[in-house]
């Protein structure tokens, strides 16, 4: 088993979004797989369309878990912390 590079932190908003995703019966294992890759410092597959955000979310990154299910996260390099900020649809996060 690979050792993680980053300590994973969850925001209160992410915890709430995670519970909402569970209630919607979204495939949580896909989210967990992405979190695992990020925690190990591995690049995400191209299908996840990982990219930097701008505007209010500058300093954060976004990737697609599914076409309209996103994960917003931030990597704080100095302290090696992966902060999971939000998860949800485009409309929920940016609408």
Name these PLM-found stretches.
Residues 1-67, 76-82, 87, 91-95:
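Basic, Lys/Arg-enriched alpha-helical interface segments
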């Amino acid at each position: 088993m690979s050792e993680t590079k980053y300590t994973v932190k969850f925001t209160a908003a992410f915890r709430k979004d995670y519970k909402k995703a569970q209630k919607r019966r979204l495939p949580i294992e896909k989210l967990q797989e992405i979190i695992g890759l990020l925690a190990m410092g591995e690049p995400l597959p191209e299908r996840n369309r990982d990219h930097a955000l701008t505007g209010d979310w500058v300093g954060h990154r976004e990737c697609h878990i599914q076409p309209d299910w996103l994960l917003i996260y931030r990597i704080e390099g100095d302290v090696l912390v992966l902060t999971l900020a939000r998860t949800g649809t485009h409309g929920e996060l940016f609408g």
